[in-house]
Regions:
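Long, low-complexity C-terminal extensions of enzymes
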Residues: 200-207, 213-243
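Conserved N-terminal Rossmann-fold NAD(P) cofactor-binding segment
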Residues: 1-18
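Substrate/ligand-engaging "lid" and interaction regions
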Residues: 79, 84-179
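Rossmann-like NAD(P)(H) cofactor-binding subdomain of soluble oxidoreductases
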Residues: 27-88
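Generic structural signal for well-ordered, non-membrane alpha-helical segments
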Residues: 56, 109-113, 172-180, 205, ...
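Small-residue-rich helix-loop
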Residues: 172, 179-219
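Short acidic/histidine-rich motifs immediately flanking catalytic phosphotransfer sites
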Residues: 15-21, 42-44
Length: 243
């Protein structure tokens, strides 16, 4: 445990003296954060986007333009399966065994890993590069297609069902797996050898199962959640910023 030294809306005050900065807002908030943070960052700091969703590419360009010597990294996902339920309240449903971390450029990985070591209870898995980590973020696969497949249920039931269980039937999971095969094919075209969404969840949560459907049904971290509306980050973030 640790005491929170400062809570502030002043970004310059928050960044002053920080060795490592973790940015955990949705992808559609990245640019606004970069615009505010880059002028306040200091040489030698480390900034980690959690997750990256290709944001490190834009951040590195902004830092280069500003003449800042800051280490940049990203993860493929958050260390926790969690969601904000109301202002000031977060429901953490599970903790991942490991998330993938990559630096940009990739050669900075050792310095980044040393800076973030021990910061979270989860482990770090070394990513080949930030393209690999961004394409390993499987939210675009496991969220977008099921949102469309469950559109009627989301609108009629307003979140009162199990999205990852009842909403991801064998047929819906086959649709997810078809989308996943496209993701893996695009990755191979870039020379990347990524694992399937099912294997990603096996690695992250330690669950077992032959198919994606089996893996989802066996994961207690996915219990008790469903979007209440189609205007949800599963579509507004995962479709334009990942897919």
């Amino acid at each position: 445990t640790a005491k929170i030294r400062l809570v502030t809306t002043d970004i310059a005050e928050a960044l002053d003296g920080a060795e490592v900065v973790y940015f955990t807002a949705p992808s559609y908030g990245q640019k606004a954060f970069f615009d505010l943070a880059v002028p306040a960052l200091s040489d030698g700091q480390v900034i980690v986007l959690m997750p990256g969703n290709y944001g490190t590419l834009a951040l590195k360009a902004a830092l280069r333009e500003a003449g800042k010597d800051v280490l940049v990294a990203e993860t493929d996902n958050l260390p926790y399966a969690c969601a904000a339920t109301e202002p000031g309240v977060v429901n953490v449903r599970g903790v991942k065994k490991a998330v993938t971390l990559a630096a940009f450029p990739a050669g900075d990985y050792a310095a980044v890993e040393a800076a973030v070591d021990g910061a979270f209870c989860t482990g770090w898995r070394k990513g080949e590069n930030v393209l690999a980590t961004s394409m390993s973020g499987v939210n675009m696969v496991v969220h977008c297609a099921p949102m469309l497949a469950n559109a009627g249920r989301i609108e009629s039931e307003g979140g009162h069902f199990e999205f990852y269980y009842a909403g991801m039937t064998p047929a819906v999971c086959r649709l997810i797996e078809a989308t996943d095969r496209e993701r893996l094919a695009v990755a191979r075209a870039y020379g990347l050898d990524l694992v399937s969404t099912a294997q990603t969840f096996r690695n992250q949560y330690g669950v077992e199962g032959e198919t994606l459907y089996d893996v989802l049904q066996a994961n207690p971290a996915f219990a008790g959640f469903a979007p209440k509306t189609l205007h949800h980050r599963f579509l507004t973030e995962d479709t334009p910023y990942s897919m």
